[in-house]
Amino acid sequence: MNYSEDTPVTTRAPNESLALMLGGGGARGAYQAGVLRAIARRYPTLRLPILTGISAGAVNTTFLAAQAAPLPEATEQLVRLWLSLTPDQVYNVHTLPLLGNVGRWGMRLVGGGHAGKEPTKGLLDTAPLRRFLERALPRDADGALPGIQHNIRTGRLDAVALSATSYTTGQSVTWVQGRDVTLWQRPQRRSELASITVEHVMASSALPMLFPAVRIGTEWYGDGGVRLTAPLSPALHLGATRILTIATRYSRSREEADRPLTDGYPPPAQVLSVLYNAIFLDLIDEDIMRLERMNRMLDDMPPSDREGVGRETGPPF
């Protein structure tokens, strides 16, 4: 498609303030794609002008933001993308490179962090994932994704935002591409204007320790779920009045929650599972509960007292 020939859209749909927020969870991104396809089939004219993503959700967010096709067709393409994905398209599955990385990690620990001539940036080599994303997301010569800018210019998309963790500064950073964007800053969180590229997606989805950090500008970045304590915040700052997010686990009953996950001393896999759930899943649930409490509090306030709340400083997230 020749994007330069498209005419900007001036009319706006009634659901213009609806945002889609997609969190992390690795292969759970495939579940997100399936749910989005079901939603698009049920509501084929649905517009999602604000798209935000973290980790695996950044892959889905960026793919949808770059599509010229209507939502039903775009989600079908997204599902096909996940169905075509195999482990060897995510990381190098050969044993020798993995053993070499593990050995170098061990030497760094024993040596007090000294990297030597060839520092290991991650246990897994994710060059295959970068190639997979470059094939899935058409790029300009400078790496920009023309589909995103086209959708912003024509009014189909207001903004897309991806979040990552800066290992250089310790901050959570949200990259935003959109129109009429007002940036925000909170303690240990900041936003930046950016032209979204595959590198931003790689940075947002770089699992700690497992995947190598990604350098953008002068900073090194890893998975966006590590430091982002308010995952709904980017959507709110970008003007969303409603947020659609997709849970990748069901709400357990009290009996199920109290049931032991393992007998005896917890194995490393169980410890890592709890850790990663805390990073990628728990914060979204907590942020939703916090937003619901704030909405109930505002509903209980007289309309005259609500006027101007958040107008000067933006959402308190």
Which residues does each predicted region cover?
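Patatin-like phospholipase
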Residues: 1-54, 62-317
